From Swiss-Prot:
PROSITE patterns: ZF_RING_2. Residues 143-217 are annotated as: Disordered. It is found in: Membrane. Gene3D superfamilies: Zinc/RING finger domain, C3HC4 (zinc finger) (3.30.40.10). One of its GO terms (molecular function) is zinc ion binding. GO terms for cellular component: membrane. Belongs to the RING-type zinc finger family. ATL subfamily. A zinc finger (RING-type) spans 100-142. The RING-type zinc finger domain mediates binding to an E2 ubiquitin-conjugating enzyme. It comes from Arabidopsis thaliana. The keyword Nucleotidyltransferase does not apply. This is RING-H2 finger protein ATL40.
Length: 217
């Protein structure tokens, strides 16, 4: 009986030892798995943070830097503002009752109003003058408030023509024809100059011959 009891005790001890070692190994495996899972989750979260948050932050910084680097837009010159048309609000001009977009009050009769020439919007003189000192566009439609002057083309000028040159008509002639006509005019002038010089030489020779004949006689 004693031997059987000893055998049972040894079996129980070996069982508990095996179960204890199994529990320890399973705990180690569980801790290792959880640790790796946490590391993977942290790396994935950091990847998402770097991809979206940091990228958006850098893009916003670039945008804010470009906005700050742009010079502030100035308003119109005081002389340009003073040159814009003004009038007194009355019944005939159909402006009474129109809302001023700057002060949000209605234009009443006998108020001094100013009209922007490019978009025809009307405001109080004091309101729009204050606006145009810092802005150069209409408060309503953002059209440039400075009047656009039409470009004047210079009138064609005709060069001086000599006394001996005949009048030429260049109407309806293109550039090539005009160039050839000018070259022909120059050659014609040269021919006339040569003929005149040769005629003068002939006349001088005839005069010299006559003088010699008179001296001989």
């Amino acid at each position: 009986m004693s031997s059987n009891n000893k055998t049972d005790d040894s079996d129980d001890r070996s069982f508990w030892q095996n179960s204890t070692s199994y529990d320890a190994s399973s705990k180690i495996f569980l801790v290792t798995t959880v640790s790796f899972s946490i590391i993977i989750i942290i790396v994935f979260v950091y990847y998402l943070y770097a991809k979206f948050v940091l990228h958006r932050r850098s893009a916003f910084q670039d945008l804010s830097f470009s906005v700050v680097s742009q010079p502030p837009k100035r308003g119109l010159d005081s002389l340009v503002i003073a040159s814009l048309p003004t009038f007194v609000v009355g019944i005939k001009n159909d402006v009474a009752g129109t809302e001023c977009a700057v002060c949000l009050s209605l234009l009443e009769e006998k108020d001094n109003a100013r009209m922007l020439p490019n978009c025809k919007h009307v405001f109080h003189v004091s309101c729009v003058d204050t606006w145009l000192t810092t802005q150069s566009t209409c408060p309503v439609c953002r059209t440039e408030a400075e009047p656009s002057h039409p470009r004047l083309e210079p009138e064609p000028r005709e060069g001086p023509v000599g006394d001996f040159a005949p009048p030429l008509d260049f109407a309806g002639v293109d550039n090539k024809t005009g160039g050839s006509s000018v070259s022909r005019l120059d050659s014609f002038r040269r021919i006339l100059t040569r003929e005149r010089s040769s005629n003068r030489r002939d006349h001088s020779r005839v005069d010299q011959d006559r003088e010699l004949d008179i001296e001989r006689q």
